[in-house]
Amino acid sequence: QLQLIVARQEFDSRRPIPRIKLPSFALVGQMRDPEVMTAELRRLAISMIGFFNVVCAMEGQPQMDIDIEKLGQAQLVSATFLPDPNQQPSQVKIQYNFSPTVVFHDQLLIVSSTRTLAEQLLAGSEKLGPPTEANTALRVDLPALERILADNRQQLIVQNILEEGSTQEE
């Protein structure tokens, strides 16, 4: 069973806040053989972050700092983009929406676009009951979806004005 979770992202004022704000998202699933898979997937996550750092460095993009830690019985591998001291607050790149994180806890595996969402899902996993028998289920929180879209309303209007020559009212 795999779950896809998408949530509005709250940004920490101590970190760069991107101009375009994306929702955070995560895949949550169960590992069949956690003793073997945890080590394999942890190495894979670290290797992927390292690979992205090499690519980012070659393209002059910000790089990520890797953090590996235990949170209770869970293991977290996370990465955050290093702040660029020369970047204007209004020009923070879209990459700063992401702090990729992988969580391993018993059989639980969380692959998240942000550390905050990963920690929330880990905390919430302890409150979950047994898995359901549903093949496909969808739950949408419409007010939350509206807030996600509102986060980028002004940016979308400006982009439309520049590309289409529209007025702000259009």
Residue ranges of each PLM-predicted region?
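Signature of soluble extracytoplasmic/periplasmic domains of secreted precursors
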Residues: Q1-E170
